[in-house]
């Protein structure tokens, strides 16, 4: 599973950051600075929770067939 950010949709609610600041870093304005990456197995549920928390749907999960 990969997670990525659509920066044009992020307006700085920081709801993802509230789920887990280490998984969802933000800048000084509250906007996500998440870099696209493969999600570690131990982070899958928190990543799903952070993506679901975004009211602007700026975070995108790309599920692998095996997930």
Curated annotation (Swiss-Prot):
The gene is fdxE. This is Ferredoxin FdxE. SUPFAM superfamilies: 4Fe-4S ferredoxins. [3Fe-4S] cluster binds at residues 10-11, 15-16, 54. Binds 1 [3Fe-4S] cluster per subunit. Interacts with the cytochrome P450 143 with high affinity (Kd=84 nM). It comes from Mycobacterium tuberculosis (strain ATCC 25618 / H37Rv). GO terms for molecular function: 3 iron, 4 sulfur cluster binding; metal ion binding. Gene3D superfamilies: 3.30.70.20. Ferredoxin that is the redox partner of cytochrome CYP143, a cytochrome P450 encoded by an adjacent gene.
